[in-house]
Amino acid sequence: MTGANKEQSGQIKILLVDDEEGYVNVLAKRMAKRQVEVMIALSGAEAIQTLRKNDFDVAVVDLKMEDMDGIEVLKIFKKMDPELPVVMLTGHGSEKAARDGLALGAFDYLTKPCDLEELLATIIKAAEQRSE
């Protein structure tokens, strides 16, 4: 979605990638109330297919997933859409991997469970960067 489309719709469109279905459903419902349109992918493979078919302002990707880790997803996303800001989510103890993600082009990382306001602020900042 281009910056102009985002301005017309008033929403930020994100791809939320995490294999914890309950967690992402709660986040998606809470973000929808804040003018954030969320598409959910419950695996890395599903995320790649979803990105092929849709445009997003930001991707939010968990580092630890069953089928492929968030670093692999980040690398593929950056090949598919080099300008897509990717925010990594990490559990305690995997911050080194998140920093590795930053070195590979991730926009930022947050530790789970993350505060919704902090996540939204990071998403908005990332979307603004994309629309510049």
Task: State where each predicted segment sits.
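Receiver (REC) domain active-site loop signature in two-component systems and cognate sites
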Residues: 65
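Non-catalytic signal-transmission and effector/linker regions of two-component phosphorelay proteins
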Residues: 1-13, 121-132
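Short amphipathic alpha-helix used as the core "switch/output" element in two-component signaling
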Residues: 49, 71-83
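Charged docking surfaces used in two-component/phosphorelay signaling
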Residues: 25-33
